[in-house]
Swiss-Prot record:
Gene3D superfamilies tied to this protein: 3.30.420.40, Carbamoyltransferase, C-terminal domain
Enzyme Commission numbers on file: 2.1.3.-
Source species taxonomy: Bacteria, Pseudomonadati, Pseudomonadota, Alphaproteobacteria, Hyphomicrobiales
Protein name: Nodulation protein U
Catalytic EC class: transferase
Gene Ontology biological process terms from the UniProt entry: biosynthetic process
Gene encoding the protein: nodU
Keyword Transferase: yes
NCBIfam families cross-referenced by the UniProt entry: nodul_NodU (NF041651)
Annotated keywords: Nodulation, Plasmid, Transferase
CDD domains noted in UniProt: ASKHA_NBD_NodU_N
Sequence similarity: Belongs to the NodU/CmcH family.
Role summary: Involved in 6-O-carbamoylation of Nod-factors.
Length: 575
């Protein structure tokens, strides 16, 4: 059975599952240098994605559209070719505790001039299904709790097993968007008005708070205002909780909360305010999760899946894991809406077969497009060993291999790789990518050696937990050590068949260092490079390696290694 999952709104994507196996997931931002969080505005994108894999719409048994904003149903205005189309979808959240798999049956999905029927499941259903079905718990036939938190919903706790899923409770009345909203009131991303949201702010705040310290007085202010605005018995808080299905009302309440916070905290350093708010939410999350586990004592292993945009917060993920409440914690590489097309397809699979495991690979995104070297570049075959030698000479390389990784983080398929041994390399990479100076660069490390370098250094193939750099390694790999000593580590097993694994092995043989800097290969504000030509046209890194071919700028004869002053003279990073 072929099931095609579709996410139309931000982080638009098309995913195809065939007989329990993920065939592909095409996130629109990873096509043609599209903007981050690209929507699907034209249904022709679905036809194109299928055609690229030798299929047409008639080959699909079921189309599934991810639900969206709305208490009873959602609406989508799109095009099919040049014709406007209105589609109806399921709401954001299920309407009753056992209603995760209640579908809306729709028609009017026009693909290749054919009018097709479709199903739609609540948006949150997709998060639960994608997190659980890709988890090791599903594969082992074990039940799991599932935490979904993001957007305009409270943190929602579910229990899932192979037979079904049930909503248990909301942990506390704070929407996931509140974390990003804090950045619009304090710090470098402060905005003069309530209008507009930067979907990337939350990740930037996690980096920025490394400049700060937690102030318990500030935390106390947030606790007081939280009770007044959200959790207490006052009329304002009760009204807020009564309107939880109204995204606009929830956002207004969050803005009011931060307006009051600004008045109370105007004399405090903004970086300390943001760090303290992060700490306040982390403590709240851990405390309320512990209480929920006392209320829901269920037989079997205590496993936890985490989904929703807040699942990208590596510090909160680690805090939950470190509580000891759970035997194991799983976060998929796409906990945010980048996984919603997969989630929509998994929802339909669950409706047919139960919450069964999905066979999948993180490298199931778009394939690299073929193309010649643009003018000014030379192309030549290049082995992995030769590439490792270039990296060992302190020259960064755009590394493009195989199909793109799923989710928002570069995992070695669409990466800029570099030696981590130079203290200037982090600044250099941030400069060429137009990123703020405080942004970290992640290490990609051989899994078996990660515990020697990082604490805990446990397997982390998708960069979703927090690690500290061990003191004896900080001076050896300064480019991947964040301001607070942490590292957003990606581990990769020596048994992996991905090309980046062989590269790490060869680089370790040359240098004794089993890791490299790893940051995403993309235009500023855009998705991953779709091909080598796009990386060459960008041109801010002089070497581009793509599936065994090295593209080199013709003007590059013998550049000084990074760290030499003349090589650091580049356009100023926006602040």
């Amino acid at each position: 059975m072929r099931i095609c999952g579709i996410k139309l709104t931000h982080d638009g994507a098309i995913a195809l599952i065939e007989d329990g196996r993920l065939v592909f997931c095409i996130e629109q931002e990873k096509q043609d240098n599209n903007r981050r969080y690209q929507t699907i505005d034209n249904l022709d994108a679905i036809v194109t994605a299928l055609a690229e894999h030798g299929l047409n719409p008639s080959d699909v048994d079921q189309f599934v559209i991810d639900g969206w904003d709305g208490e009873i149903e959602s609406r989508f205005q799109v095009l099919s070719g040049a014709a406007p189309v209105t589609l109806t979808g399921a709401p954001y959240v299920e309407r009753h505790p056992d209603g995760l798999l209640d579908s809306l049956d729709g028609s009017g999905l026009i693909l290749d001039d054919r009018v097709l029927s479709y199903k739609s499941y609540p948006h949150v259903t997709g998060h639960v299904a994608s997190a659980y079905c890709t988890s090791p718990f599903a594969k082992a036939g074990e039940a799991a709790f599932c935490l979904v938190w993001g957007g305009c919903i409270f943190p929602r706790l579910y229990h899932v097993d192979g037979h079904g899923a049930r909503f248990l409770e909301s942990l506390f009345p704070m929407i996931g968007q509140a974390y990003a909203a804090a950045g619009h009131y304090f710090g470098p991303y402060k905005q003069p008005s309530r209008a507009g949201w930067d979907l990337g702010v939350a990740g930037k705040l996690m980096a920025y708070i490394a400049l700060s310290s937690i102030d318990e007085d500030i935390v106390a202010v947030f606790e007081e205002l939280y009770e007044e605005h959200f959790s207490g018995d006052a009329e304002r808080a009760c009204r807020y909780r009564a309107n939880i299905n109204d995204a606009e009302s929830s956002l207004i309440a969050v803005h009011d909360f931060f307006d009051a916070s600004v008045v109370r905290l105007e004399d405090k350093a903004p970086e300390n305010v943001l760090a303290s708010f992060h700490s306040f939410l982390e403590l709240l999350l851990v405390r309320e999760m512990a209480l929920a586990m006392q209320r829901h004592s269920l037989p079997g292993p205590r496993n936890l899946c985490i989904a929703g945009g807040c699942g990208l917060n590596i510090k909160w993920n680690s805090a939950l894991r470190e509580t000891g409440l759970f035997d194991a914690v799983w976060v998929p590489p796409f906990p945010n809406d980048s996984g919603s097309a997969i989630g929509a397809a998994c929802s339909a699979m669950a409706a047919h077969e139960g919450f069964v495991p999905l066979e999948w690979s993180v490298y199931s995104g778009p394939a690299l497009k073929n193309g010649d070297a643009p003018p000014g570049w030379e192309a030549a075959p290049c082995s992995i060993l030769e590439l490792a030698t270039i990296l060992a000479s302190n020259k960064p390389v755009v590394f493009l291999a195989g199909r793109a990784e799923l989710g928002p983080r570069a995992l070695g398929g669409r990466s800029i790789l570099a030696a981590a041994t130079s203290p200037q390399m982090k600044d250099y990479l941030n400069e060429v990518k137009f990123r703020e100076h405080f942004r970290p660069v992640a290490p990609i490390c051989l899994e078996d050696l990660a515990p020697d370098i990082f604490s805990p250094g446990t397997p982390d193939p998708y960069m979703l937990f927090d690690h500290q750099t061990r003191p004896e390694w900080k001076d050896k790999i300064p480019a991947v050590v964040h301001l607070d000593g942490s590292a957003r580590l990606q581990t990769i097993s020596r048994s992996s068949e991905h090309a980046v694994t062989e590269l790490l092995i060869e680089y370790e043989k040359l240098t004794g260092i089993p890791l490299l800097c790893n940051t995403s290969a993309n235009l500023h504000g855009r998705g991953f490079f779709p091909d080598a030509a796009a990386a060459c046209e960008w041109g801010r890194i002089d070497h581009v390696w793509c599936n065994g071919v090295l593209f080199t700028k013709e003007r590059v004869a013998e550049l000084a290694p990074v760290g030499v002053a003349d090589n650091m003279k580049m356009s100023t990073c926006p602040r």
